[in-house]
Amino acid sequence: MDHIRNFSIIAHIDHGKSTLADRIIQLCGGLSDREMEAQVLDSMDIEKERGITIKAQTAALTYKARDGKVYNLNLIDTPGHVDFSYEVSRSLSACEGALLVVDASQGVEAQTVANCYTAIELGVEVVPVLNKIDLPQADPANAIQEIEDVIGIDAHDATPCSAKTGQGVEDVIEALIAKVPPPKGDASAPLQALIIDSWFDNYVGVVMLVRVVNGTLRPKDKALLMATGAQHLVEQVGVFSPKSVQRDSLTAGQVGFVIAGIKELKAAKVGDTITTLPRKAEAPLPGFKEVKPQVFAGLYPVEANQYEALRESLEKLRLNDASLMFEPEVSQALGFGFRCGFLGLLHMEIVQERLEREFDMDLITTAPTVVYQVQMRDGTMVTVENPAKMPDPSRIEAILEPIVTVNLYMPQEYVGSVITLCTQKRGSQINMSYHGKQVQLTYEIPMAEIVMDFFDRLKSVSRGYASMDYEFKEYRPSDVVKVDILINSDKVDALSVIVHRSNSQYRGREVAAKMREIIPRQMYDVAIQAAIGSNIIARENVKALRKNVLAKCYGGDISRKKKLLEKQKAGKKRMKQVGTVEIPQEAFLAILQVDDK
C-alpha cells in the first residue's frame, strides 16, 4: 500500500494537462516510443481536435524513484470542462492527490480554480506545477503569486517543468511521491469500489473503471451495484497501462477496470459503489448523485426518412454517454425528431458534432432552452423543457427559472465590459475581488441567458482573456413570457422562445426582421408576426413575386389593364389559401443569432 500513489491532473483548457500526462506515461515506460502519440489518453478524435478531455481515462504506471524504491502510480485523467464537473468530482474522489497544472505564461484561470476547489473540498492533496516554462513569455513568479492569492494554497515550491520538451517532468513525479499520501484502506474488509467512469465495448459490454477503496475484487465474484441493486458476475479485472492488462485481482488502493457482462451503460452509473455478495458493505461510498440534464434542444433529421437512423445514432451515443437524455417529439414545422437533454452547451455541441461526424447525420437543431418550473393556479407544479409545451398563460400563477452562480476571471482592463455584459444578461453582482492583475467576479445570472450566447459574447468583449465556470443555484420566480412566431397566421412551434418580458418586444421585432431576410419570396405575400399569447408585438411582410401581366398590352384601355391586374390578384389570393411556406434551415439558426440589445 505504501508504494501506491493515486493522482489526477487538474488544469484549465490548453494549459498542457494531456501533454504532461503523455510525458509521465513515457517516462514510466507505459508505452514504447513507437506507440507513443500526442494525447494518448484522449481517445475520441473530437477530444484531440478541440484539445479537451471528455471521458475519464487511467494509466497504471511503475516508476523507480531516486530513493531506489519502486512506486505504482495510478494516473486518472479528468475532464476539465464545467459541463463535466460531476465526472471531475468522481475522478478526484478516487485520488489522494492532484497535480495542479498552471500555464506559467497565463496564470490561473476559472476552470482551474473550480476544479481545484472541488479537490480541496474532497480532501485531496494539491501539488502545484508550473508548465510551459520553455516559453519566452513565461512568468513563473507571477503565476506562483496568483496560485497563492486566488486559490490560497502554498506554492513557493511549485515544480517548474515543460511538458512539451520533457524538462522537469521527473521532478514533478518526485514531488508527487513526496507530497501525496498513500491510499488508506483494508484489503480484507468487505469490498467497496467506486465507479469513476464506464463505457461500452462492442465485445464485452460495459467496462467500468473503478477505484477499490476497501476489500479485494476477483473474477467470478458476485458483484452488487448499490445504487441500482443489480447483481452481476465479474468476468475479468485488470488495469490500463494505458493498454489494458488483465490481473488476477484488484485490491484496496488500486485503480483498474471491471467487466461483468453488463449490457446497458445506464446500469453502471458513475459514482456508484460496487460491493460483493455474500459479504456486502454496510453503506455505499458518499457522493453519488443522479446527473440531471440542464439544457434541452430539439434535434430533427433534415430528411424525414432519416428518423430511425437518428434514433439508432442517439442510442449508440448513449451507450457511451449516460448523461445524454432523449425522447421522441413531433413538431408541425419540422416533423419527427427528438427532444434531447444535455449537461451544458459544450456537451450539446459535442453530441451534435459526433452525430454529424461519426454517424453522418444532417440535423436541424432548435434553440437551446432550460427547464422552467411552472406554478399553476390549481397549486400543481409543472416542469417545462420545451417552449411549445408551455401551458396557457391564464392558468399560470408564476414561472420559476433556474439561476446559476457564475465565476468569471479576467485581466482588470476588461472588467468594465464584462460587467456591462452581465448586467445586460439580467445578472446581479455578488462579489468582486482583485488578485494582482486578475479580477474575480461572481454573478448570479439566469441560466436561460447563459445558454443563448453568453460564452461567445464574453470571449469577444474580453478579447478571449476572460474565463468562466458556472453551477446551478436555485429556481426563482421570474417574469418570463413565451414569444410565438406566426407565418401567415400559422404558429411555427419550433421557433417559439421563452424570454424575459423586458426583452420580449425587442426580441420579437428582431426575430421577425431576421425571418424576413431569410424566407424566400413566394408567389403571394407572406406575413411574419411575433406574438405573446394573442397579442401581436411585431410584424414584417415578405412581398410577393409577380409577373408583369401588363407587358403585352401596349397602351390600350385602362379597364383592360385593371381586369388583368384584378385577375392576377384573385389568383394570388387563391394561392395564398392553399399555399404553405417552406421555412429554410437557416431560419432556425437565425433565432440563435439574434443579439440582445
Curated annotation (Swiss-Prot):
Protein name: Elongation factor 4
Binding residues for GTP: D14, H15, G16, K17, S18, T19, N131, K132, I133, D134
Keywords: Cell inner membrane, Cell membrane, GTP-binding, Hydrolase, Membrane, Nucleotide-binding, Protein biosynthesis
HAMAP family xref list: LepA
Any one GO cellular component localisation term in the record: plasma membrane
Predominant cellular place of this UniProt entry's protein: membrane
NCBIfam families, alphabetized: lepA, small_GTP
